[in-house]
Amino acid sequence: MSQWTPEYNELYTLKVDMKSEIPSDAPKTQESLKGILLHPEPIGAAKSFPAGVEMINSKVGNEFSHLCDDSQKQEKDMNGNQQEQEKSLVVRKKRKSQQAGPSYVQNCVKENQGILGLRQHLGTPSDEDNDSSFSDCLSSPSSSLHFGDSDTVTSDEDKEVSVRHSQTILNAKSRSHSARSHKWPRTETESVSGLLMKRPCLHGSSLRRLPCRKRFVKNNSSQRTQKQKERILMQRKKREVLARRKYALLPSSSSSSENDLSSESSSSSSTEGEEDLFVSASENHQNNPAVPSGSIDEDVVVIEASSTPQVTANEEINVTSTDSEVEIVTVGESYRSRSTLGHSRSHWSQGSSSHASRPQEPRNRSRISTVIQPLRQNAAEVVDLTVDEDEPTVVPTTSARMESQATSASINNSNPSTSEQASDTASAVTGSQPSTVSETSATLTSNSTTGTSIGDDSRRTTSSAVMETGPPAMPRLPSCCPQHSPCGGSSQNHHALGHPHTSCFQQHGHHFQHHHHHHHTPHPAVPVSPSFSDPACPVERPPQVQAPCGANSSSGTSYHEQQALPVDLSNNGIRSHGSGSFHGASAFDPCCPVSSSRAAIFGHQAAAAAPSQPLSSIDGYGSSMVAQPQPQPPPQPSLSSCRHYMPPTYASLTRPLHHQASACPHSHGNPPPQTQPPPQVDYVIPHPVHAFHSQISSHATSHPVAPPPPTHLASTAAPIPQHLPPTHQPISHHIPATAPPAQRLHPHEVMQRMEVRRRRMMQHPTRAHERPPPHPHRMHPNYGHGHHIHVPQTMSSHPRQAPERSAWELGIEAGVTAATYTPGALHPHLAHYHAPPRLHHLQLGALPLMVPDMAGYPHIRYISSGLDGTSFRGPFRGNFEELIHLEERLGNVNRGASQGTIERCTYPHKYKKRKLHCKQDGEEGTEEDTEEKCTICLSILEEGEDVRRLPCMHLFHQVCVDQWLITNKKCPICRVDIEAQLPSES
C-alpha cells in the first residue's frame, strides 16, 4: 500500500484536475476521496482492514498482476493472486444521489478510515441502502466496481488503484485517452479489485474513472474470511430480497436492485476478479492478460467464454439505481465481444447474491438479467429483462438515465459531478457507450452539461479508450440500462476488443452525453485499434467500422426520443459481436435515444465465441441501434471471435415492449442475408429495423437496416453461437428480406407489403399451363395444384370457364372452408378472409352437395400452409383467392377419380324420361312429377342427354358429374365413394 502513496498524490492531482469538471456533488465526494488519496493512511491501514478488504487488495493485485506491468502492484498483489482475485472486493461508493454509499465512503475517508469504513459497511450486512451499497460494493463485484464507477464521488479506489498501478500505469496509459489524468491510468497492475472495480474506468482509459468514483480497493493479501464471505452472501441475499420486493426484479438481477449497483459497478464488479479490465487502448494490453476468470471474487461469477485475455469483458450488470428507487440491473456479458477478448465475464445479473455462489461460468453461459426497475429518469416503464443464458437480453425501460450513463461514460471524467451519470456514462461510454449515451443524454444533458465538453474530450479519449473500455461496466442504466447496460458494459467491450468502434462508442457516449439528441458522427479517430492485445480479437478490428457506428449513434439520437418506450431491450442485449454495429445503437436504444450504446454494448457480442454472429439481432432492439448494421468486424476475420458486428438490430423501438430478453426471439428470426449491413451510419430512423430485425414481431422491423451479416442474425436472445436462434427465426419469414422503410410500419402494413410481394411472385402460376383459361383469382402459385374444380353450376352444363367462376362458387369454396373449420382451425391468415359472409352467396342446392363434401376433407386446414411453399402472409386476399386456390388444390389432395375409374365405376347412358313409380298408373301426373334434375347444375334432365348414374344410383349429367368426380370421387349428394360402391353395383 505504501507504494501507492505517491500514486495517491498523483491520483489526487488527477482528481483535482477532474474536480473542476465535477459537479458540486462530486466535489464533496472527491473531497473525501481526496482525503483518502492525500492520506494514504487508509491505504496503509487497508492492510489492517478486515480480511475481506485485504482479500480484495490481494485479489485485485493478483488479477491484475498479469495484466499490469506495474511490478509494484504485482508484488503487492502477487502473493494472494488467485485467492485475492477471487476474494478481492472493491468497495465502490455509490453515487451520493443513489445511496448513502458514497457519502459513507466520504465519511469514512474523512475519518481516514474510508477504506475500513467501507470494509465495515461491507462487512456488516445492512438492509440500509447505504450499508447495502457498501456491502454491495464490497461483496458484489458489480456493486463495488460499479458504484465507484457510477458514483460521482471520486473513486478513492480509483485513485488508489491508479496509484497502485503506479505512475507506470499512468505513463503507460499516458492517460491519453482522456487528457484528464483524473482517470487513473488503470494498469492491470492495479489491484485486480481496483481494475475490476474500475474496470470500466480502466479500459475507459480511466476516462471513465472519474474521480467521481469512490472506490476502495483493499489490497491485502489475506483471503476473504469465511465470515466475510457469508456476510457478502447475506448482503446480497438481502439486497436481492429488497430488490425483489421493491422492484420485483428478476431473481438474477435482484441482487443489484437494492444496491443500485451502477451498471459500471456491476459490470466492473462482475468481472471484478476476472478483470476490472478497463481496456484502454494503452492499458488494454495490460488488462487483457490479467483477469483470469479464476481470480474472480467469490461473489463474482465470471463467465469466461473465451480463453482470450479477459479483456474487460465484464459482463455488464447494470444496476442502475437512480436517486429514485429505480435500479436496472443489467447483467450481461457486455457483449461477449469482451469474451472475444477472452475476458471472463461475470453475470452480475445473476444478482449479487448469486454471484458469490456462482462459479465462473463460461462466458457463453453468462446470463444477462436485466431488470429495469422503475426508472426514475425515464418514464421508464419498468421492463423485466429476462436474460437468456446465452443471450443477454435486456428489456430496457427507456430512460434518460441510460443516456446519462452513456454520457457519463463518455464523459466519464468529464462530469464527475454527475458521477452517477459520469460513471454510468463512463461505463456506458466504455462499456455501453451507445446505450448509456442514450440515457445519459437525458440526464446528462442536464448533468453532463458540465461534463459535456469534458465528456467530449473524455469521450474522445474515451473513444480510443472506449474501445478498450468496451468492457466497462454498464453504466447504471436505470431505464435503458438493459440494453445499454449489457451493451455498454460489454458491448463496449468490443471496444476493448480493440474494436475501432471505440469511436462509435465515444461518439455515442460523448455525443449523447451532450445530448442524446445529437447524432454523433463516429469519431473514426479513436480506432484505438485493439489497443488491447486481444488475442482472440486481432487488432485487425478495423477502426473504419466506427464511422458506421457514428452514423448509428446518430440514429440513436433519434431513438432516444423514443426512449420512453420501455422497449425490451432484450434482444439488444444480444451480445452481438458486431459491437460497432450497434454502436449506432444509440438509435438502437428504443428506450434510450442513444440506445445505440445499448445496442453496441450488446452487440459487442457478449458471445465472444460466436463473434461472427454478434447476433446482430442484438435484438435489433433499439432499431436505431440496429440502425448501424455495420458488421464492422467483418473485415477483421480474426476478430471473428472478436467480431463485433453488432448487426444493428434494428428491432424497431416499436418492438413490443413485452418483448422480453429473449422474448423477441422471433423478432430476430429474420436472418437477413444482410451479411454485412452497410455501416449505416445514420439511421436516424427511430426504429430502423434490420430485416432480420423483423424480430420485432410487429414486423415494424420491416425496415431491415442494412442487416448485419446473417451470422449476426442475431438471435439476440439466442446464443450467439447460433446465428439465428430459432426463437428469432420465426419472425424472419414475416419480415421482408429487403429493408423496408426505416420507419416503423404497422404490422398490417408490413404484411400488406409482403402480400404484394407475394402476389407478384404468385402471378406466375406454377401450373397455369395445366389449367383452364387463367382466372384472375386463380393466378396463384398453387392454382395448378388441383385441376380447375368447377363447382356444380345449374346455369351451364358445360365446364365453367375460369372467368365464370361465380361469387357463390367462390363463396362455397371459401365459405365451406370457413364454415367447416372454425377460424382457429384455419391458418391464421385465412381467418382474415372473411369467408363466412360469402356463404350468403351459396345456393341451398349446392350447399348440401359442396359444403359437406368439401368440409370432410381435413386437407383444407392445411391448404393455407401453402403447398407451393408460400404461406399466406397477406392479411387479406381479395375474393378469397387464396381459399379458392386452396380448395382447388384440395381436389388433387383428395385424389379425385381418374376418367378411367369414373367410366369403370359408373353407368353412362342416354337419359330417358321415366315416370315415377307412384305416378305410372296415372298419366295425369304433372310433367314435374317425371322430371329429374341434375343436382349439380340443377337443370332438368332432358331426353337423350348424356347422363351418368353413380353406384349410389344418383343421376347427373356426364359433364357435370365428371368434373365433380375428377375432383372428388364421391357422390355429390350422398358422398358415397364411387369405387366403394362398385361391388354392390354390378
From Swiss-Prot:
Associated pathway? Protein modification; protein ubiquitination
Name the encoding gene, please.
RNF111
User: How is this protein organized at the quaternary level?
Assistant: Monomer. Interacts with SMAD6, SMAD7, AXIN1, AXIN2 and SKIL isoform SNON. Interacts with (phosphorylated) SMAD2 and SMAD3. Part of a complex containing RNF111, AXIN1 and SMAD7. Interacts (via SIM domains) with SUMO1 and SUMO2.
* Regions of compositional bias (Basic residues) in chain numbering: 174-184, 508-522
In which family does this protein belong, per the annotation? Belongs to the Arkadia family.
Q: What is the lineage of its organism?
A: Eukaryota, Metazoa, Chordata, Craniata, Vertebrata
List the ranges annotated as motif SUMO interaction motif 3 (SIM).
382-386
GO cellular-component term (any): cytoplasm
Activity regulation comment? Binds free ubiquitin non-covalently via its RING-type zinc finger. Ubiquitin-binding leads to enhance the E3 ubiquitin-protein ligase activity by stabilizing the ubiquitin-conjugating enzyme E2 (donor ubiquitin) in the 'closed' conformation and activating ubiquitin transfer.
* Entry protein name: E3 ubiquitin-protein ligase Arkadia
Q: What's in the domain note?
A: The SUMO interaction motifs (SIMs) mediates the binding to polysumoylated substrate. The RING-type zinc finger mediates the E3 ubiquitin-protein ligase activity and binds directly to free ubiquitin. Non-covalent ubiquitin-binding stabilizes the ubiquitin-conjugating enzyme E2 (donor ubiquitin) in the 'closed' conformation and stimulates ubiquitin transfer.
Instruction: State the species of origin.
Output: Pongo abelii
According to the UniProt record, where is the region Disordered?
66-106, 120-191, 248-277, 337-373, 389-471, 506-561, 610-646, 659-684, 696-719
Q: Where is the composition biased (Low complexity)?
A: 132-151, 252-271, 347-357
Residues in RING-type zinc fingers: 934-975
Which residue intervals are annotated with compositional bias (Basic and acidic residues) in the record? 66-89
